[in-house]
């Protein structure tokens, strides 16, 4: 799944996504690829795999959930921020709480949250 396919499919499943979301996803992907070796986050051998496996397949299970009354989301073992950061990008009004035991992955998450300019992430 390339970037255009990803955008097309996400727009079908999440009616509230806008260009800012896709810009943040691109920033996320590039930062993930840049920091992957340093933080040992995940296998990022192919851009199509990143869009299909890490982003699309991580978001689709949440496409049928109504987040309009949801105020808090807890992501346990967040690792590289999936699915928590993805949900925060789609639903910016939620408060995201991240629990990650690995220090270097937690440091990555702190840097990512700052890079994406996200508020309401603990």
Regions found by a protein language model. Give the residues of each.
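Conserved SAM-binding motif I beta-strand of class I
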Residues: 95-101
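Short alpha-helix immediately C-terminal to the canonical SAM-binding loop
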Residues: 105-107
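Interfaces and regulatory segments of ATP-dependent nucleotide/adenylate/phosphodiester-chemistry enzymes
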Residues: 2
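Class I SAM-dependent transferase core
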Residues: 5-70, 74, 111-121
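Conserved SAM-binding loop of SAM-dependent methyltransferases across substrates and taxa
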Residues: 80-93
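Conserved S-adenosyl-L-methionine
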Residues: 75-79
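Generic structural signal for residues in well-ordered beta-strands
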Residues: 96, 121-122
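Short, conserved acidic/polar surface loops in the N-terminal third of protein domains
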Residues: 86, 110-111
């Amino acid at each position: 799944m390339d970037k255009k396919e990803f955008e097309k499919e996400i727009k079908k499943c999440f009616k509230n996504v806008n260009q800012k979301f896709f810009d943040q996803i691109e920033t996320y992907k590039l930062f993930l690829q840049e920091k992957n070796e340093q933080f040992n986050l995940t296998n990022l051998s192919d851009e199509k795999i990143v869009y299909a496996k890490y982003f699309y397949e991580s978001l689709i299970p949440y496409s049928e959930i109504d987040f309009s009354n949801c105020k808090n989301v807890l992501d346990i073992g967040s690792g590289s921020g999936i699915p928590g950061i993805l949900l925060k990008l789609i639903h910016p009004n939620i408060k995201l709480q991240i629990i990650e035991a690995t220090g270097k992955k937690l440091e990555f998450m702190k840097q990512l949250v700052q890079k994406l300019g996200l508020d309401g992430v603990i």
